[in-house]
Amino acid sequence: SAHDYSAVTMVATKLFYVWEFDRGSAGFTSSATRENGSTLMEVSLEFYIPKITGVVNEDLMMLATSCGITAIIETYADDCAAPAVTYMFVLGWDEIFEETAYMEFTSGEQGTGTGLQTANGTAITLTCQQGEYPREYSGTQASIPIV
């Protein structure tokens, strides 16, 4: 479509990190507002990382102190197709603000719980303002430069 990106080009030292989540523990929202003829999208990405470990906390510190985060997220259409149909969207970059639309670490709430069956993990929120709704990423996952 005309509202997608088909490739990702990165500076050699800047790569994507892969985070995977349990079903129902991650998602994004994009809320548009218009004022004085300008439209802004408030984009929020929320996800839950289970288990608190030293390695997880090291990764979380890198995320919490990063400046300029762009995320490519994958969502499922959940239409019972086999294999499942997925869509990927780019958050933190658009054709209006470009790299200045980057996402920032907004909050991270970590807890171990009090019982044996209580969840143990961290809820993370990243946010940004964009000048347009998130664009679909139509390239392949294999073409995304990752660590």
Regions found by a protein language model. Give the residues of each.
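Structured, beta-strand-rich domain cores
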Residues: 20-94
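Mixed-charge, glycine-accented linear interaction segment located at domain edges/termini
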Residues: 94-147
